[in-house]
Design a protein with these regions (language model features):
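C-terminal motif of bacterial Sec signal peptides marking the signal peptidase cleavage site
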Residues: 14-17
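N-terminal, intrinsically disordered, polar/charged segments of Gram-positive cell-envelope systems
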Residues: 22-70
Length: 367
């Protein structure tokens, strides 16, 4: 009897041991399955995250803009830029090539008249440009803000010698003077011989000659320009209505701008008539209008000087509205910075700009 019980006990123990092994195998199998499932899930999550990241990259694709007009580009703009003085005496009109300037300045010189400065990029396609006139210190100052060469014909004692104000000379004056490099300019003989223009109103250059001069003088460095300007197709700002804007210079000369709602641009007029580009016959028009107020003082011979480093007030007009702004500039080779009165960076409309530098005892009139 005892032998039978012992045998039964051994059999029971063997059966229990087998059951335990089967459970361990089952648990191990379940654990491996769980781990595999977890791995698959992690891979799927990574795929989802990867797709989300790719989607995010597409949505956040960087937008490249032209540094002076804000036009959208496929890649960063790497071109060359230069500026030319433009004679604006009544007897010198019409001017040529000016409608293709990206930025167009007007500043009062001596005698109560104004002179203009046209800033061009990729100027090879521009035809005749001018009439070209002599330089002044403030033209040297403004072109230094862009770090671009100035095309001119002689100048005042200060303007022709690289001064950027009444006391300081540019460390590196980048310029092309017709008196030194006449090969990049030409005289319009028809103007002088048949049309009754004075000699000083007959000097021109061309976009092609400007580009050639930049290459010959080593000024054609193609770099990524960044002047710190912000642009939008439709700038948002709380301005007053301004369909008519009149710039009044210290000597009384005016420049009038009328907003054309059909084109979204301000059309220029001076001397009692439309401001015309003689090369195309079109009226000068601008997306942005800026008036920058600063101290204007006079030296020998009535020469004007302007404080263009520091800060001041101004006005900005775009899309039929106008708002007060502030401008600042920290150093001679630094660009102008524009903000709203509360310090918010100013956003310009995509397109070209007219900029008037005027005495801070003057202002603009608008309605």
């Amino acid at each position: 009897m005892k032998r039978i019980l012992a045998i039964l006990l051994v059999l029971c123990m063997l059966l229990c041991g087998c059951g335990s092994d089967e459970e361990e195998v089952t648990e191990a199998t379940q654990s491996e399955a769980t781990e595999e499932s977890s791995k698959v899930k992690v891979k799927e999550e990574k795929k989802v995250e990867s797709k989300a990241e790719e989607s995010s990259i597409v949505e956040e694709k960087e937008v490249f803009r032209h540094p002076l007009t804000g036009e959208v580009l496929e890649e960063p703009w790497k071109g060359v830029a230069a500026a030319s003085t433009i004679n604006n005496a009544p007897d010198a009109l019409p001017q040529y090539g000016i409608s293709q300037a990206d930025v167009f300045y007007e500043i009062e010189v001596e005698g109560g008249i104004t002179r203009m400065l046209a800033v061009f990029t990729d100027m090879e396609e521009v035809g005749s440009i001018g009439p070209v006139r002599s330089a002044r210190s403030y033209f040297n100052n403004i072109t230094a803000a862009y770090n671009i060469p100035l095309f001119h014909c002689g100048g005042s004692t200060y303007g022709a010698n690289g001064y950027y104000d009444s006391a300081n000379v540019l460390p590196e004056w980048r310029h092309v003077n017709e008196m030194e490099y006449p090969q990049y300019f030409f005289r319009d003989s028809d103007r002088y011989n048949y049309q009754g223009y004075a000699w000083e109103h007959t000097l021109f250059t061309t976009g092609e000659e400007m580009a050639a001069a930049l290459t010959d003088k080593g000024y054609d460095v193609r770099e990524v320009y960044d002047f710190g300007l912000s642009f939008a197709e439709k700038p948002e700002f709380n301005g007053e209505s301004a369909t008519e804007v009149e710039i009044i210079f210290e000597g009384g000369k005016t420049y009038s701008l009328t907003y054309n709602a059909g084109t979204g641009r301000y059309e220029g007029a001076e001397y009692g008539g439309e401001h015309i580009d003689g090369a195309t016959g079109e009226v000068m028009s601008f997306r942005n209008v800026l008036a920058l107020y600063t101290a204007q003082y006079h030296g020998e011979g009535g020469l004007s000087f302007y404080d263009l480093i520091g800060s001041g007030n101004g006005h900005f007009a775009c899309d039929g509205k106008i708002i007060p702004i502030k401008w600042s500039r920290s150093d001679i080779y630094e660009p102008f910075v524009y903000t709203l009165e509360d310090g918010t960076p100013l956003t310009l409309g995509v397109g070209n700009s007219y900029i008037a530098i005027i005495s801070d005892v003057r202002t603009v009139e608008y309605n």
